Amino acid sequence: MLFEVEPATVGGHAVLRVRGELDLLTAPQLAQAVQTQLSVSPSSLIIDLTDTTFLDSSGARQLALAARQARGSGTVLQLLCPPGNKPVQLVLGLLELGKVVPVLESATFS
């Protein structure tokens, strides 16, 4: 499956749209995209997992590391994962990632 991390700015928020499988092989691509976004010191960064089809422990670890990096740079990091994305919601819940970084079920960008 094709993996893609697409940066965007929506309503003043830096957004990384993650498409495909976030796993051991693709987590480094997300890490690089997060570093690039944090290098410009956004006040907030949303990692949009709406189109993420699979998440393993390596991908979840990368999300937790991104949260730590964001805190260190003064950026508020949030994950966006709608309830319809059951496979990713399940992993986020099992690993209690919501205790590390807020997980939004929907977002309105203004």
Describe each region flagged by the PLM.
Residues 1-54, 58, 64-110:
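STAS-like cytosolic regulatory interaction modules
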